[in-house]
Amino acid sequence: PPGSWDLPELPEIGGPLEGEGAVADAQARLASLLGVDGCWFGVNGATGLLQAALSALAGPGQAVLLPRNAHRSLIAACVLGGIRPVFLPVPFLSDRGHPGAMSAQCLERALTALPSIPEVIVGAVLVHPTYHGYGSDPTPLIAALHRRGLPVLVDEAHGTHFAFAAGEALPTSSLHAGADLVVHSLHKSAPGLGQTAVLWLQGMRVSAEAVKASLLRFQTSSPSALLLASCEATLNWMLSPAWERLLQRRLKEAHQLADRLRAAGLPLSRSDDPLRLILVTAERGISGLDADAWFMQRGLIAELPEPFCLTFCLGLASQRGLAARMQRLWRRLQMSQPSSGPLEPLLLPPLETSSTPELLPALAVRAPACELSLQDSGGRIAAEMICPYPPGIPLLIPGERIGLDRLEWLLDQHRRWPELVPGKVKVLAEGPQVQLG
């Protein structure tokens, strides 16, 4: 039976928050090997560790800087902890229809636009890399936030392999760039079992005791020994010469694959992570959602379908034969579609400046609410998230007012992917309305 695969939380095994046992020994050893001050395994994915880490940074009534492409788990942490998010704009790649990576220049502009760093803002979050593999050097971003006295949490769920790569084959990991807290998924961008993740702590800006107290609130009291063993085994392997040899081989193959596909005319966009392939289907008049459904029926599985793109995650398995298969299926897909030009451009998100919800998200989700059609929601305050998943980046946050420009943009998003961006939204029960012109 499945129970035979697992073990109870025996003293000899312990758990992520125990002072003794095999898990505590493994965490201490790995922290030492990576030169950091703390290591905690997680069995509720990067989601649970991000929420615990954010809760260690900020408490009720305090605020944190969040990039607009923050994962929905961080918004949920704000709701659970009574934290106010202060959103920083990120570049929008209009030809691909999704956010890019925040650059040092973009961050400096956003920070300069804030009148000052109020005392209520007690920390900052960065995303490195994005789901699509975009990731500029995080060192100057982290340094800019540290200069303003802010500890930095980095969501590096999609860049775990960055921290375990030699040389300059991949972007710099935020763990090596001085971030105070870093969350790595061990199944998204590493070969661990689903739900496994790890949280790293370094420096003196965040206390280990605050992290432990937060983990105690957010993590299960009965962690699976199977998943904990996967955390240790995955990290052990990623510190071995065998991992480095495999990673370098797969990176070389990924570069060759991308070059071959581009030479064959496939509209591939550039990513900072060679293990991500971004097929810009919109250039040929095809929605990424339609392309994904068509490919899936023929056994070609992508990672992330969007209105303008289809992103593939190459992973660590051999991709022998993939280039020829993708070329063949791409030709067949184009032949199956009526000839047309590029898709109509997306409306740009009206999120170019720093902002904070008018109402604390924790209050907005608990306030009396009613459901309206999206068309009729102008001027109202949102009582829920609108968040297509994947990628899990909210388009609307509880507590934000739905102004005219935001409403027009949300309606455009609904038209582009109606199954993931609903045509209805919960709003606070009373409030002024704005009519579309």
Residue ranges and their predicted role:
Residues R96-H161:
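Active-site phosphate-binding strand-loop segment of PLP-dependent enzymes
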Residues L170-A213, Q219-S230:
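Active-site PLP attachment segment
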Residues G3-G48:
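Conserved N-terminal alpha-helix of the aminotransferase class I/II PLP-enzyme fold
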Residues D259-D405, W409-P418:
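Conserved C-terminal alpha-helix-loop-beta "cap" of PLP-dependent enzymes
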